[in-house]
């Protein structure tokens, strides 16, 4: 049965967030949809554009969780632990309160764990992935993603592509991985650029934008690398659009952006693999001696 009482929908969204507003057509979903031929292990939505708030416990008997299927879908979870899969289309999936597992699937998605210790993965496409409160495990998958831990001690893994990472509050682990096709070329300059410089540097690797040593942030090295296997250098960069590299977080997805392109002159530490010279990542506004590193096993980051 479907209901459209928005007051009841809002009451069920126990920790409604200010980041992502509900669409006006959202409905409360209290029972499976009549999708003939669906796999009983999954809770399938329709192949159209759906907008649902999940009632508590609605996914309890479907071990494979929710599949949004085709369409540009909006799903807000309940207060329980839920498994959601966006599949194809531009989807917005919000976990709600509970330790949720959320995967975007194909295309551009906006994913938000909200409250609870969540696993959130963009999978394919250029995604926005937010952890929310508690200690979250966040990964980008393929594509150029924006990852935001928010509060709690989070683990952020960009995976493939050139990603932007914000840990926000808490002691966060930013995991850098070696990638096929990584560049070993030089970037930026040793001195600040002259006033009026508009020669923009291409960001070649994952960019950590709010590393905070005072909060206990560390950088995790994957692939068997240790601190002895990397070299650090400090460079001055000219990058843009500046709104995509603010230390406070990404420009809101769907936000109205004025047309002018904005330049940011900043300083960053460049992290390279010593043996190949390949750039593993960059860290904004932090000097090399402020960075702390740990080695992370492939098993520790295999979740996905």
Residues covered by each model-derived region:
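Short, exposed beta-strand "edge-strand" segments with a Pro/Gly-rich flavor and a Y/T-containing core
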Residues: 38-47, 73-77, 218-225, 278-285
């Amino acid at each position: 049965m479907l209901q459209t009482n928005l007051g009841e929908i809002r009451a069920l969204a126990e920790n409604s967030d200010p980041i992502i507003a509900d669409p006006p057509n959202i409905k409360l979903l209290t029972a499976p949809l009549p999708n003939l031929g669906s796999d009983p292990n999954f809770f399938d939505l329709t192949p159209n554009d759906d907008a649902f708030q999940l009632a508590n416990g609605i996914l309890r008997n479907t071990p494979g969780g929710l599949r949004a299927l085709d369409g540009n879908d909006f799903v807000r979870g309940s207060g329980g632990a839920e498994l959601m899969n966006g599949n194809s289309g531009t989807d917005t999936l919000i976990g709600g309160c509970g330790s949720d597992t959320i995967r975007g699937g194909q295309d551009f998605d906006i994913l938000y764990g909200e409250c609870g210790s969540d696993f959130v993965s963009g999978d394919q496409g250029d995604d926005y992935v937010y952890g929310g409160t508690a200690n979250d495990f966040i990964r980008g998958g393929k594509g150029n993603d924006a990852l935001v831990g928010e509060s709690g001690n989070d683990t952020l893994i960009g995976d493939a592509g050139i990603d932007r990472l914000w840990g926000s509050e808490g002691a966060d682990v930013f995991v850098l991985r070696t990638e096929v096709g990584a560049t070993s070329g030089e970037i930026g300059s040793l001195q600040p650029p002259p006033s009026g410089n508009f020669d923009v540097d291409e960001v070649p690797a994952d960019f950590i934008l709010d590393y905070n040593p005072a909060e206990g942030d560390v950088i995790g090295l994957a692939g068997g690398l240790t601190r002895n296997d990397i070299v650090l250098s400090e460079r001055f960069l000219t990058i843009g659009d500046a709104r995509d590299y603010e230390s406070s977080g990404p420009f809101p997805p769907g936000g109205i952006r004025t047309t002018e392109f904005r330049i940011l002159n900043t300083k960053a530490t460049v992290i390279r693999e010593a043996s190949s010279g390949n750039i593993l990542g960059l860290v904004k506004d932090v000097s090399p001696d402020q960075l702390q590193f740990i080695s992370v096993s492939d098993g520790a980051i295999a979740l996905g």
